[in-house]
């Protein structure tokens, strides 16, 4: 089902920090029979495309400090961040989506940004929604003014 596929893609992405990690991570899923070679190749291509989007390139560089599936306690709830990255060019917050764009995703990411700014002394954070489909679609999420 699309939902199961979305959960599975998130699981795989949580194990990948750089493009170099992607191949090994995907191989392990092929070995255990979770995905076939074609799916692995398609996911590898997808990840390479995401990592090469100009506004995201720093967030996938070897020098980045990457935290995947980070849990943050904020306003009486636990927020789970898909990918939080610190680089010499600032911080990145990336949320992966496998479905259709929705306005509520922007609201959710703004809440994540508020939480991270609380923790990190108002550090500048660039936030992006990354839609993974046949096409890679990236939307920057702006803070509320």
What are these regions (language model features)?
Residues 1-90, 106-107, 119, 130:
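Nuclease catalytic cores
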Residues 75-144:
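Mg2+/Mn2+-dependent nuclease catalytic core
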